[in-house]
Amino acid sequence: MGGSDFEDDELFKDLYGEENEKKVESASGNQETSNVTPTKENEGYEELEKSGEAGAERTKENPFREEPGADFDRSGSDQQYSAEAEANQEDDLNETSQQAPDPSSYDIRGQALSSATWDNAEDGENSKNDNYNENQSALTGSGAMESNEDNAEETSPFNREDGKMFIGGLNWETTDDSLRDYFEQFGEVLDCTVMRDSTTGRSRGFGFLTFKNPKCVNEVMSKEHHLDGKIIDPKRAIPREEQEKTAKMFVGGVPGDCTEEEFRNFFNQFGRVLDATLMMDKDTGRPRGFGFVTYENESAVEATMSQPYITIHGKPVEVKRATPKASLRDSHDRHQHGYHGNANPYYAQNMNMYGGMTPAMMAQYYRQMQQYMEAMRNMPAAAGAVPYPQPVMPAGMADWQQQQQQGAAYFDPSKMNQGTGDGVPFSPSMPSGSSRGGYHGRNPGGPNRQRYRGRRDGRGGNTGGGHSFHPYRR
C-alpha cells in the first residue's frame, strides 16, 4: 500500500471511525488488484462505482451515517467530473438505492418529506420562533410595562376624580372652549363643561374640568386666575358622597379684608383642612362675609366648636356645623308630614294645604263670613256703635292667619267679639294695613296708633263720642 493510500486511510478513519477500517482496506485492495488502467473517460465512473459499493455496505449497518461529498478524492487530488459522469452517478444511485438518507428529511414516522412539505415545516417553525420571541419581549420588556402602568395610573377612576376641579365665579360669556384653552396651559384637560340652565341655556356661572395628571390641580390652586375679565375661583372637586362623610363647618361674619389663604391657615390650627372657601359675589367679586371649612375628620370640628370665642382680624366670627342640602330637604319633609295626622294621609294633606283646617271647616267659616258681610251692608248708620255678632273663627284659623299676615296687624282671638274700639266690629276678612280709622300701626289701641287727620266736621270724623272716622258713615 503506497503513501497516498495510507493518508487515505487516516483521513477516512477521522471521518467515519475505525469500525469501517476493514471496508476501506477491502476497497483499496480491489483497487490495487484491478488491471484496468483508468482513463480520463472512465476514471470518474470507476471511482463512483467503488464508492457506491462501499456505501451500500455501510448503509446496511447505519442508514443515517453521512457520506462524504461527491467531490472527495481518495487519492488526495482534486478531480473534475464531467456532466456525463455526474449523470451516470445519479443513475447508479437510483438503481441500487445505496445512498445514505439524510435524517432531517424524515418525519417522526420515518416517512420521507417532500421539498414542499419541508419548506412548510420550516416556515411553521420560524413563525413559532417569531411568536415566542414576541411573547418574551412583551413579558420581559420593562419599557413597555412601565408605559402601560403609567397609562393605567393616569386613566384609573380614582386618579380621574383626583384631577377634577370646580371652577366658580365664571363670566356669563365664558364657554367650554375658552375655559379649556385657559387651563390647558397647566396640563392636558380630559373634559371641560360650563354648567348651563336647562331652560334658558344661560351659563350658571360655574363649571367643572378634569386634568389627566392630578398634580396639575395643586399648581392651579397655587395661583390667582383671571378669565374673561373676572377673577375665577378654582377648587378641588369633592364627590357628593365624600362631602356627606367629611366634617364641614359654616363660618359667618368673616371680615372683608380676610383672604382665602388667611382663612385656611387660621382653621389649620384645629386640624387638617381639606378645603376652605370664602363665598364671593358673582357680579362684584367682593367677599360676601361667610365661607365653609371642610376638615379631614370630626375631631377637628369638635376642637373648633370647643373654642368660646373665635376672632379673625380682631372680629368675632360665628362657627357651626354645616348641614348638607339633602339633610335639610329631609328635615323639611318630616316637618311637613310628621306633625299632622300620621294615621290619615288625606287628613294630613288637607291640613298642610289649608293651614290646619279641613275643607268642611273652611266651608262653614266662609258661610258665616257671607252672613256677616251681608249684615254689615244692611246696617243703619246710627247703629255703627253696636257690634254685630261675628262669625266664630274655627280652631286653627288664628295660627293660619298669623302665618299669612307675617308682621301685619296683631290678632288676638280673645278680643274677637269686643270690636276694634272704633265702633266697627272686627272682620277677619279685612286686609291688613287697611285704612280703617286711619290705622297704620301694629297694635290697635297701642302707643303706635295713628288716627285719621281729616276735616273736623260730621263727615270728616268728629272727635266726640270716642268714635273715629268710618268710611260707611254718611
From Swiss-Prot:
CDD domains: RRM1_Hrp1p, RRM2_Hrp1p. Residues 27-39, 129-140 have a biased composition (Polar residues). Residues 1-163, 412-474 are annotated as: Disordered. Residues 435-444 have a biased composition (Gly residues). Residues 1-11 have a biased composition (Acidic residues). Residues 425-434 have a biased composition (Low complexity). GO terms for cellular component: cytoplasm; mRNA cleavage stimulating factor complex; nucleus. The keyword S-adenosyl-L-methionine does not apply. Residues 12-25, 40-76 have a biased composition (Basic and acidic residues). InterPro entries: Hrp1_RRM1, Nucleotide-bd_a/b_plait_sf, RBD_domain_sf, RRM_dom. This is Uncharacterized RNA-binding protein C660.15. It comes from Schizosaccharomyces pombe (strain 972 / ATCC 24843). The lineage of its organism: Eukaryota, Fungi, Dikarya, Ascomycota, Taphrinomycotina.
